[in-house]
Amino acid sequence: MWIEIPECYEVLRNVFSKFRRHSLTAAMVKLLMRADTHVSFTVPAEEPVAKCTFSQVLAALSVSLGSMVVGFSSAYTSPALVSMKDRNITSFEVTDQSGSWVGGIMPLAGLVGGILGGPLIEYLGRKNTILATATPFIISWLLIACATHVAMVLVGRALSGFSVGVASLSLPVYLGETVQPEVRGTLGLLPTAFGNIGILLCFVAGNYMDWSELAFLGATLPVPFLILMFLIPETPRWYVSRGRDDRARKALQWLRGKKADVDPELKGIIKSHQDAERHASQSAMLDLLKKTNLKPLLISLGLMFFQQLSGINAVIFYTVQIFQDAGSTIDENLCTIIVGVVNFIATFIATLLIDRLGRKMLLYISDIAMIITLMTLGGFFYVKNNGGDVSHIGWLPLASFVIFVLGFSLGFGPIPWLMMGEILPGKIRGSAASVATAFNWSCTFVVTKTFADIIASIGTHGAFWMFGSVCVVGLVFVIMYVPETQGKSLEDIERKMCGRVRRMSSVANIKPLSFNM
């Protein structure tokens, strides 16, 4: 027996059908009304929905504390460079060039960490790889805090960036493999929320501490993360991949609760692994290039591309100028705090909505908000740079900027990382996540380093219009290619994307919710 809730869906379909005589409208309606575009609200009446356990929350919280260290590391240069440049020591002279490398070396090191992180999570395991990043984080911050030369800061930032690259890959994979489908969206966004807490903490502390004191604070953040990681298990799927089914059962029982029947889920994981093994080649890279695996990998790469080419780093870089053009008298450091607060609030909202609206709906909202605000910012700077009077709309850049950050943090900020841990097949999850993470950091470095050249070539207005145009293409990409994964187990997602339904018919009925992809 099935309970149909969204009657409005059928009403909308009937309304839109009246416009089928218009070919363009019909095409757009067909795309927007695709079954995997929206969340289905049909649930089997006889099957109770599993409840989230404290153990899952503890696991998500533990790894998310690592994300707070990542956020703190990413934001460090913004408040720290000012006090670094004020230090009157010849051996510690921070020029504009060396200062740019203090910030720029982290994404480069993150690229290396992203490449090596894939083999690490397959060889060491998801948990042990995350755990292994804590010590390098502490060492990197102590190097920076005790630095007597710029070179020590650069080494510390490089080590921190490497750890960030490894962590940004392994955190979503761990959560994707441990959290049950019904709450995977909410708990899966905890790393992003804690990452934004780390950013906000760095901005606030940077108002009262110099670069060295701020680095000492950074060295303390991995300690609670390190302690809590010892309390949680390795993922059941990694244990199964190593033939340790008994350990997988214990880990799954800990995560789902002592009274939970984990046999159906464990059998599904084992079946999925066996099926993947039958179709695996001797080379991990050859596995990536298989048609069945290439589709989810390309979708993940596409999401990473549109995340960074939305211009988020460019807009953050231009924060102070936007506030100045808005006629704001707010202190520059306070502006960065406002950015951190907006980031955190938006991500918190996303955690409440993602398991209700689904991934794609939040991506739609996010992309449309970014398109409107980027085009608006471009229009403002076009009028301003051509001698137009913008004094009466000095509030517009500030409003656009806040809405842009809100929109990004609702969807395209956290969801590409969340879906990376969901849609990549289990057999290649480590190597594919490594490729996706390295690609993301490459895009980050390119956008950050070329933004000034883009401004010089096509102007500020042209840069914002360019990023807005990329977001338009990104919206089409989401509509046409990105599947809805809300409420589905990883095995269900893999069967749908890789076309292995027939071989796994005995497991196909193990569904906590019923959805159409």
From Swiss-Prot:
Extracellular side: 78-100, 157-158, 206-212, 318-333, 382-392, 459-461
Keywords from the named record: Cell membrane, Glycoprotein, Membrane, Sugar transport, Transmembrane, Transmembrane helix, Transport
A single GO cellular-component term on record: plasma membrane
InterPro entries: MFS_dom (IPR020846), MFS_ERD6/Tret1-like (IPR044775), MFS_sugar_transport-like (IPR005828), MFS_trans_sf (IPR036259), MFS_Trehalose_Transporter (IPR050549), Sugar/inositol_transpt (IPR003663), Sugar_transporter_CS (IPR005829)
Residues the record marks as carrying a glycan: 88
Transmembrane spans: 57-77, 101-121, 136-156, 159-179, 185-205, 213-233, 297-317, 334-354, 361-381, 393-413, 438-458, 462-482
One BP annotation, GO: trehalose transport
Cytoplasmic topology ranges: 1-56, 122-135, 180-184, 234-296, 355-360, 414-437, 483-517
Location of this chain's protein in the cell: Cell membrane
Protein name: Facilitated trehalose transporter Tret1
Protein source organism: Culex quinquefasciatus (Southern house mosquito)
Gene, per the UniProt record: Tret1
